[in-house]
Amino acid sequence: MSDYRLDPNDNINVSEILDDLEHYHPRRHGWAWRTPAPGLKMGQFTYEDCSEPLKSSVPLPPAHYFGDIDPQPLPTITTEIASGRFEDDIRRMRLAAHHGADHIMVIRTAGQSHFDGLIEGSPQGMGGIPVTRKQVRAQRKALDMIEDEVGRPINYHSYVSGVAGPDIAVMFAEEGVNGVHQDPQYNVIYRNINMIRSFVDACESKKLIAWAGQAQIDGAHNANATARDAWKVMPELMVQHGINAIFSAKVGVDKKNICLSTVPPTATPAPCIHIDLPYAVALRDLFHEYRMRAQMNTKYIESSTREATVTHVLNMMISKLTSADIQSTITPDEGRNVPWHIYNIEACDTAKQALVGMDGLMEMVELKKDGYLREKARELKERAVLFLEEMVEMGGYFNAVEAGMFVDSGMFPERNNDGIARKIDGGIGLGTIVKREGDYMAPVTAHYGYNNIAQYGAANPSDLIGGCTLENPDKIVFIDELDDEDNCNVRMAEVKEFAQPGAKFIRPEMEWLADGTVMLTMFFPANKLIAEAAAIECCKRMNLTDIEVISKEIMHPAEGTRIEAKGKVPFSIEIDKLVLPKEPDVMSDDEIRADIERKPMKVVCGTVGEDEHSVGLREIIDIKHGGIEKYGIEVHYLGTSVPPEKLVNAAVELNADAMLASTIISHDDIHYKNISKINRIATEMGIRDKVIFVAGGTQVASAQARANGADEGFGRGSHGNHVATFLVKKRWELEKEGKM
């Protein structure tokens, strides 16, 4: 094994981490909770709710006024890392650990839930890393060194879900992963993986989780992000929590390691504390035997990092007033780009600052025992019990899901009949469950269910082979790389002159080593159209490339606008010479309806690529959201994760007038690549000049969409009337040209 150690005054050497990786094995298994330090004295102060301090850390900015103290709150602090390049994530993990994170959650690449087995090597991901043994092993090895540096165990975490859940669970147990997401309901509701397969797989996965002593987090919080109105799924959330919690306990997971993933459902300008606190109280009343993983609200984040941060501080007030064993953080830039280094650190510092600032709060205040708080909490519990009873009356969970009972936009028992429905005899993995024969035997540890080892006279299954990979890690077959091009060695070679330590060059970066990304914050004493155009002109004059405005905040409709822009590295401005962006051209509802009555219109639409987002597209098309259906446009919705080929083929089969492609994930410009691919396929099939092609998504810009082959692109803030107007006017153009 390499004798490489971190130098506190030097950069981490990722090449050294990768050296001799095939011989690395984790030095510990299981989750590590922080050690409480009641009555902790630091500087001139005494703390009531803190944990043992770190050996090495970066204090909050004002700490120099107080002797550079850096008290650590009691809850575990989570940071989620999702750059797509694990080698860069290792550096970010070190940053986060020094700012108080001891739970590093690694996000998977888009679509990995649907992979039917393990993958190997170190390919680049989209919106996360492709979780492979090599990448897990390298990051766990790095965290071993980082936790020695900061003086506290660091928990490494990823996801045990999808079609290959048990395969991943085995690998995670082997490689010393400390925490996991595991909830078969996530597979069923959000990934459309067959129900029976999902629950059978979950039994095997949870058995391994129990063996490894991992903390398990459920997936109920996804209902918050998916529901039309997040505060209306609170009763259902408690039922989802209950199903996974008791299921996990019965399989054998220790209740002290079963964590409920709870999210305050609202954000201001809603009266969020008034709505969210009774829910938090009700949840903790019902599930006092289990741990609480307090997530932060993501559904209502916009592009303002300030607004997101305030929302997250309010979320942590609820954690403090109730309880949180794990305080997850969300980067405040999640609403505008793949999270950057600096915002992972901002999120960690926000959690530390807020929780330490509220130290000792519950010695001075208490939640009222009567009145609105308790009455509302009881009401929510009653609604949850009614939900559970109705689910049982319907024949159980599977039947209830098939009937669309979950993620309905009504506050149960109110129903709007728009929930997510999955078929018992449908979904990915259908028909893959096989009953074990009477002589079935698997010589492995932590195996769920029937295992006939008595026929061989063994007491422990793995004794038959001298121990399985869980007991004897030398039996693990380590595969380094499978792809000669898509791997970390190639990526690191491309930027080797920027690699620390001993770099020859340095560039600013936000996501990847030497990516050259910078951000500019500007204020212009003008309306938003002029301010946006002027900001872009500033960036051009600074010779930035890949320029994009990522946030616009109106200070006053006429007096001023705050702009944030990003670009890559490689002044009075005459406003009259600026090319101002045009406001959306919107026809009246009557005008649009009249044209559709004149000539009916048929469109096919779906979320393309390996992308499961659906809410935004639904708002564009659904009649109940004021979408294009209300004008009489015939809509054929193909769902999520739609391959570009399927969208074009559907347009051909249905003789559609238009294709609508939604694309939310923007990592590595995958949204524009998919737009370009759809345009190319339609051209090759000979229909491109006969069909209107519209693309949309939160990160889609009109000009870039058109440059990649779409007729128009619609970004954040677009509505059904904007899209309908464009469809009608574009059809007029094609009619004049004799193409429609």
Region spans (language model):
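Glycine-rich phosphate-binding active-site loops on the catalytic face of alpha/beta enzymes
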Residues: 100-113, 175-192, 244, 315-338, ...
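Domain-level signal for soluble alpha/beta catalytic cores
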Residues: 1-2, 24-37, 113, 336-337, ...
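Active-site beta->alpha loop and helix N-cap motifs at the rims of alpha/beta catalytic domains
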Residues: 29-65, 77-99, 103-234, 555-557, ...
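Structured C-terminal cap/extension of enzyme domains
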Residues: 325-329, 339-374
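Short beta-strand/loop segments at the ligand-binding rim of alpha/beta enzyme cores
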Residues: 68-81, 148-160, 213-214, 285-299, ...
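Conserved, mostly hydrophobic/aromatic
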Residues: 96, 319, 613
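Catalytic alpha/beta core domains of metabolic enzymes, predominantly
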Residues: 127-131, 140-144, 160, 181, ...
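Active-site mouth loops of central-metabolism enzymes
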Residues: 15-26, 74-91, 153-164, 227-232, ...
